[in-house]
Amino acid sequence: MKKSKKFLLMVALAFVQFIAHAQSNKTNGNALLEEAKKAIAKSNAILFDLYLKNDGSVVKLFAEDACIMAPNAPALCGREGVAKFFKDAYETGGVRSGKTTTLNVYGDGQEFVTEEGLYQVFDANKKLVDEGKFLILWKKTKDGWKDFRDSFSSNRIQK
């Protein structure tokens, strides 16, 4: 009888320890995810400011191995590809400003998270040029959270 009580006590203690560990990981994961969300919001807040100035440092918001996967175009990868994307959008696309709205951020905040959202882009006269949705895979790097894979699609019907 003593052995079975001892065994039950050990099982109960192991279970309590397991639950406590799981809760600790959940709390830590939430803190990491919140950290990622704050970094993403900060990056999003300055993206179009840099773009509006045609500032090449916009590439620093992206991981060195980032890819922008625009619709109907090959992926543009690396900082050189990201720079080309923004240069072309500014010089030939007529885009002068934009706005993003984050709908959700998914993940545990440890290495990668995914941002889901909506975008709008405007010309120099503040006329809406395009609007759509996006998914961005963010990567935690030694320099903080960086845009790693950026994919978007227009809500407008292609002509």
Residue ranges: model-predicted function:
Residues 47, 58-59, 66, 78, ...:
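Hydrophobic pocket/interface hotspot
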Residues 61, 67-77, 88-95:
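A short gly/proline-enriched turn/hairpin at secondary-structure junctions
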Residues 1-27:
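Bacterial Sec-dependent N-terminal signal peptides
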Residues 20-61, 159:
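Short, low-complexity N-terminal intrinsically disordered segments enriched in polar/charged residues
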Residues 131-156:
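Short beta-strand edge/turn micro-motifs at domain boundaries
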Residues 44-47, 51-55, 65-66, 86-93, ...:
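Sec/Tat-exported extracytoplasmic proteins
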Residues 85-124:
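Surface-exposed, charged secondary-structure patches
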Residues 126-128:
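Residue-level signal for glycine
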